[in-house]
Amino acid sequence: MERTRRDAGLSTANPRSFYGARPDTSISIRLLNVVRRGLRRTNSSVLGAISRRLYIRATQRRGKHLGEQQRVLLSLLQPHDPLKREKSLPAIDLVVPFVEKDLRSLELVLQQALRNVRNPISRIVLITPQNSENTGPRFIREESHQILADIISSRSNIVLRHDQDVLGPEILAELENRFGRGDRNAGWVTQQLIKLSAALASEAPASLILDADTLLLSKKTWLNSSGRQLLQLANEYHTDFMKHTLKHFGVPKELKMSFVTHHQLMQTDVVRRMFPEGGASLVAWWQSSTDAIGRDLGDYEVYGAFLAHHYPTRVAHGSFANLFSPHLTTFLADRERTGWSPERLIPGYCSVSFHSWAQVDRADRGD
């Protein structure tokens, strides 16, 4: 592999060194990479369960969550595909909210999801803001309309919906009351509400919600026929999300790990139990926020915590193994030049996220 990468003109170091946000030079990071490669071959649910019990005991003794390196290790100790042996898998929806800047890689995002999701995909639901004339997507560049049209025409099961249609009247009224029209502060809470609203409205047993800046790199089974699902453990830790989840739903957190993983399966019956009155329940969840613009609301965190607390037998914990990359331009250029798949360019990871706000290229940030 090293010789092949060199022949292709690519770095022979770990992908974290040349696509990641931080240099891969420390001994601890190098050890984690060795562990990562070994654990992917084991896919052991037993090892994952033992490590979670040890982590819970450690946090109970300490009285708080552990540090980032310990959380990363715990996530890596989980199986990457704990439901791999399952057969007769139920079909699910794939839901991808996006904006114009995401069109550059949206086709690749869909390709990677279809390649690596083992469950059949019944529908691909693309969700984007509508323009002020209510005539189509809110795009600035004329060529963006053709790019989207080509994506939609390439697959028969794609459905295009607009934010306003997904959110519904109760949420739209609350947005108008709080922010008026065009307030950028509405962006964060709108994202949370769109994903949960889409999951609520799904006719499938579950929806895989996928951020439009995230590529899936590893085959995974998301849901089995008895309703048991993959729930990945993240490296991040968001205290505000957890405090609000405890406040609104009364859900404590024994396993002090995050579920903010940039993509997550949401089962329809679980989301409907969380928000039994649909849009009105979502508004109540928002109104219980202690932050003026809802920055303590976390869609992935609240669903994961609720599921783990109320339906523990329906949870199969898995490894996140995500690479956070500020180098979308470099990645796309390398892929174009070599013809390699994303999995080959970024081996050893389950997904990679190119968050626009972190990109080193201003054009990729949407500036």
Residue ranges and their predicted role:
Residues 2-90, 352-355, 360-367:
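Membrane-proximal basic amphipathic "stem/tether" segments
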Residues 112-121:
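Short, acidic, metal-binding catalytic loop of nucleotide-sugar glycosyltransferases
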Residues 207:
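Short aromatic/hydrophobic "clamp" motif used to bind/position activated sugar donors
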Residues 217-246:
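Conserved donor-nucleotide/metal-binding helix-loop-beta segment in metal-dependent transferases, i.e.
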Residues 257-340:
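Catalytic core and acceptor-binding pocket of nucleotide-sugar-dependent glycosyltransferases
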Residues 144-197:
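Active-site-proximal specificity loops/subdomain of glycosyltransferases
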Residues 121-131, 161-164:
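Short beta-strand/loop segment that forms part of the nucleotide-sugar
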Residues 93-101:
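A conserved hydrophobic helix/loop-capping motif in glycosyltransferases and polysaccharide synthases
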